[in-house]
Amino acid sequence: MATVPTALAGRHFLKELDFTAEEFRGLLELAAELKAAKKARTETLYLRGRNIALVFEKTSTRTRCAFEVAAADQGASTTYLDPAGSQIGHKESVKDTARVLGRMFDGIEYRGHGQGVVEELAAHAGVPVYNGLTDEWHPTQMLADALTMTEHSDKPLTEIAYAYLGDARYNMGNSYLVTGALLGMDVRIVAPRLLWPDETIVEVAQQLAVASGARITLTEDVKEGVRGADFVATDVWVSMGEPKEVWDERIGLLGPYAVTMDVLRATGNDDVKFLHCLPAFHDLGTDIGREIHARHGLTSLEVTDEVFESAHSVVFDEAENRMHTIKAVLVATLA
C-alpha cells in the first residue's frame, strides 16, 4: 500500500512552483510506489467513485492516455472533452465552465494554450485542477522526467546534471529551468540567446537556486553546455499550423543545437541518457518530417534517428512515467 502525502489533498497542480521541493519529491516517491504496485498487480484503489474531466483544447496522445489509464487503474472515471466538444471560451466563459464542471467532477485536467485559462479554471472550479500543458508550463512532464532520471542514475537528484537543447522560450524550457532549480539540480539551458527563457523566469530560477543549491547555466555553446551532463533533453522545433517562414527561421537558428551522437560524446559521459517529451521528428515517418525534408533536405530535426533509437535513449520509459506520475498527482490530491 502506497504512502499517500495527505498535505496535497485538494491542491491544484498548475505549474511546478505550486509544490515545494519536499512535496515534489514526495510525489516522485508515491509514483515509484504506484508503479511498482501496478507491475505487481497489487494496486490499492484510492479513487473509487471519483470523476475527472479532461479538457483538451490542444490534442495529445500521451497526456490523454496517461490521465485515462491512471484514473482507470485507480477506479476513477474520466470524461474527455476535445476541442470540438467543449464550449469553453467560445460560447461559455472559462469562469462559467469551471463552475459547471466543478459541480459534476472531482477534478479537472486542462491542456491548452494560455496559462491564464488553467489559472481561471482553478480559481472558480472548487475542485483540484491539473495543467496537462500550456504554452508557459508543462508540470506533469517534469514529474515524469524527474522519475525517469532517478531510475536511470544512481545519483541523488541534487547531483544530477542535465542539459536542455533547443527553443527554451516556452513550456519545456521554462519547466526544465525552474524544476531543476527547485530540486537543487545542475541545470543547463543550451540555446541561441534569442531563444532563452524570459528574464523573469530566469530570475525566479536563480532565487530558487539560492535556497536549493542548484547550479544554473544558460549558454549558446553546445560543448560547454553538455559537458559532464547525465541527461540531454530536447523538444520539437516546429508545430503544425505555423507559417513556413517561422519554420525556416527556427530551423536556421537551431540547426547547431540538434542532438546528435557527437553532442552525446561531448558530454564525456558514456552512460549519458537522452530525454524527449515526444512526439519527435527523428525520421521521415511523419507528415511534418516529410515536409521538412522536401523543403530543407533534412532527415531529422531536433534529434537524429541514431540517437533516438540508441541505447542512450530512454524516451519510452519517460513516456510510460507520464502515467505513473500523473496517477501520483491524482491520488495525492483526490484520495
UniProtKB/Swiss-Prot annotation:
Q: Name one Pfam family in it.
A: OTCace
Query: Is Amino-acid biosynthesis given among the entry's keywords?
Result: yes
**GO CC entries:** cytoplasm
UniProt enzyme class: transferase
Q: In which pathway does it act?
A: Amino-acid biosynthesis; L-arginine biosynthesis; L-arginine from L-ornithine and carbamoyl phosphate: step 1/3
**Keyword check for Transferase:** yes
Its localization reads: Cytoplasm
Q: Which residues bind carbamoyl phosphate?
A: S60, T61, R62, T63, Q87, R111, H138, P139, T140, Q141, C277, L278, R322
Assigned EC number: 2.1.3.3
Question: What InterPro entries would the database entry show?
Answer: Asp/Orn_carbamoyltranf_P-bd, Asp/Orn_carbamoylTrfase, Asp/Orn_carbamoylTrfase_sf, Asp_carbamoyltransf_Asp/Orn-bd, Orn/put_carbamltrans, OTCase_ArgI
Source organism's superkingdom? Bacteria
Family of the protein in this entry: Belongs to the aspartate/ornithine carbamoyltransferase superfamily. OTCase family.
Q: What does this protein do?
A: Reversibly catalyzes the transfer of the carbamoyl group from carbamoyl phosphate (CP) to the N(epsilon) atom of ornithine (ORN) to produce L-citrulline.
The molecule here is called Ornithine carbamoyltransferase
Source organism of this protein record? Streptomyces avermitilis (strain ATCC 31267 / DSM 46492 / JCM 5070 / NBRC 14893 / NCIMB 12804 / NRRL 8165 / MA-4680)
Annotated gene: argF
